[in-house]
């Protein structure tokens, strides 16, 4: 059942999150250079506010706390569905970004609600890190630690601080960053291990769905990159800067095939390639994440390198 729910969340809710991201990131930057450009900008902004954000604002709030773990196509809540750490971190990021961009008090209210619930229910107060799933009542269900989930937590909390100035969000993001570096980073070969038990031991199965075969994955590393970029934008720490630069280097050297110009999806702990699958969607996503990270660092040499890889 847990595996089914994990797959459902990733396959059905992830595309919705991508639509939100595209709308939030593109809408402000579409300059009305022509009548057609203005029409496109207005359509994207309207769709984002009236069809996407409004849907989640109307249907996702759980009166008993936080947000429902799953909704039907008509918005009807599945009240007993478990709540995912990644979904809730994305809700936190989404409404924080929406508030920062549009200044709507309703978005601020939802962002604050998501922040409070996430900190109180998803962050492990004993061992650190983020639970993968909690029950509908907010108690832990799957306490495994997935690096992917911890990364999204840093991403969402950093954005909440950026949007609202809430220092608790920044401090929690910093704590999670330090946990990732102390518990998840490979001390021998660098990079970030995929999965752990609650106590940071080796899990019986790898990956968020338990079907993973790789100790290190491209997907996890690009979201560590994304999280560290978001945190560095609001916390100019020298150690974080060094690690952000290192993650950029790992992606462009260990997880990028310079012959095929595709990403390497799955590796063992020594960075040996475990498969020859190409993922065009992740290639596109990473091209943007790399350039964003490089621009956050502000190093012309790194920016040039990342733009070259992105265009290849």
Put a short name on every predicted segment:
Residues 33-312:
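Glycan-recognition and catalytic cores of secretory/periplasmic carbohydrate-active enzymes
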